[in-house]
Design a protein with these regions (language model features):
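Phosphate/pyrophosphate-binding betaalpha-module
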Residues: 159-165, 170, 177-179, 191-196
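C-terminal charged capping/lid subdomain of soluble metabolic enzymes
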Residues: 3, 76, 297-349
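Conserved N-terminal diphosphate/IPP-binding helix and adjacent helical/loop segment
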Residues: 1-107, 111, 115-130, 166, ...
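A non-catalytic, amphipathic alpha-helix used as a structural packing/dimerization or gating element
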Residues: 42, 46, 163-166, 198, ...
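Alpha-helical scaffolds flanking conserved acidic
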Residues: 91-102, 134, 221-232, 336
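Acidic/histidine metal-binding catalytic segments
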Residues: 94, 156-169, 218-225, 277-279, ...
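A short glycine-threonine-serine/GTX helix/turn-capping micro-motif
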Residues: 188-199, 308
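Acidic, Mg2+-coordinating active-site segments of isoprenoid diphosphate-utilizing enzymes
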Residues: 2-19, 61, 83-87, 111-131, ...
Length: 349
């Protein structure tokens, strides 16, 4: 059974934030983020230097890859590696290499996704597929994937290569399910959770495992960090689904809806308003969908309260992530992961 089958109170994370602020004497989230930035700045600087050392050249595959890498994402997965490693030996060279690998795998999936989805914008700029073409973007993703696997192998950290191969397999299966189910409404909730477990949560889990193993943490600590990564990944995807219905995010608004992807807001809206289902099925039966056709569906989704339900899903899994951290020793690394989890609810892109 999916780990997502049951849910805690959607308001629990708000209670947890109050607990962090009062009982533990934590500062505001803004102050926590400032502390986090100061604490990990050196680690992230070292990570970015190693990422920038990836070969550049005249070959279009390198140019397409660096087109995306140079746009600088949130680097949340590498941050997870770094923070997990801080429970033990710290952000050593082998931990740093694994952090770079996590970012390369993530970037490879974005390059491939933008081709599959015919996306035109990524991080507020034209996608690599628009600038360099679909073939170059696909080969660039392949190159980043091979570069990541090579780094993992040479890191010498036991077990992380096999785990990454499993993650990649899970990603491919999830993408296949999403492709097969595109535009199909039946079984939407079950399919949704199967897809995000493979597409998003799996790599977050790996990042936490990689950081833990690079620092030789006990098995129990690794397991707690893996659970944190899983729930953080689910929360991250839920927020991403919510942002599809907002402007000024650096992505095309309603892109998921236009591509026929049945995300959580759509799942909830269809469950709450059955009359929406035939309208949506008719719309998604067309190969291309115009913006004026999307607007009424988006309005119905918003009116159903589905965005609030999606926010509640994200809050629920942030709460679960925080619960996992209770099994780890108190200190700066745990506080930093609390901040990362809480901040994931507030992101705007």
């Amino acid at each position: 059974m999916s780990q997502l089958a049951t849910h805690a109170s959607p308001t629990a994370v708000l209670d947890r934030l109050a607990l962090v602020s009062t009982v533990r004497g934590a500062p505001s989230l803004a102050e926590r983020l400032a502390d986090l930035d100061r604490w990990v700045k050196s680690d992230l600087k070292d990570f970015e230097a190693e990422l920038d050392a990836l070969p550049r050249g005249a070959r279009v595959v390198h140019q397409a890859a660096h087109h995306l890498l140079d746009l600088r994402g949130k680097h949340l997965r590498p941050l997870c590696v770094a923070l997990a490693s801080r429970f033990g030996e710290g952000f050593t060279p082998r931990a740093r290499s694994l952090a770079v690998a996590a970012e390369l795998v993530h970037s490879a999936t974005l390059l491939h996704d933008d081709v599959v989805d015919l996306a035109e914008r990524r991080r507020g700029q034209p996608t690599a597929s628009v600038v360099y073409g679909n073939a170059a973007s696909i080969f660039a993703g392949d190159w980043l994937l091979i570069s990541a696997l090579r780094r993992i192998r040479t890191s010498g950290v036991e077990g992380v290569l096999d785990r990454m191969l499993t993650v990649i397999d899970e990603m491919i299966v999830a993408e296949s399910v999403q492709l097969e189910r595109r535009g199909k409404i039946s079984g939407a909730r079950e399919d949704y959770f199967a897809i995000i477990e493979g597409k998003t949560a799996a790599l977050f889990r790996w990042a936490m495992i990689a950081g833990a193993r690079s620092a030789d943490l006990p098995v129990a600590s690794e397991a707690a960090l893996e659970r944190f990564g899983f729930h953080l990944g689910v929360a991250f995807q839920a927020v991403d689904d919510e942002l599809d219905y907002k402007d000024n995010t650096g992505k095309d608004p309603l892109a998921d809806l236009r591509e026929g992807k049945v995300t959580f807001p759509l799942v909830v809206a269809i469950e709450r308003d059955p009359a929406l289902r035939p309208r949506l099925e008719e719309l998604l039966a067309h190969e291309t969908v115009e913006a004026d056709q999307l607007a009424p569906i988006a309005q119905a989704v918003r009116a159903s309260g589905a965005l609030q339900a999606t926010r509640a899903l994200a809050e629920d899994h942030v709460q679960r992530a925080l619960n996992a951290l209770d099994e780890l020793p108190a200190g700066a690394p745990r506080d930093a992961l609390v901040t990362v989890a809480l901040a994931s609810l507030e992101r705007q892109s």
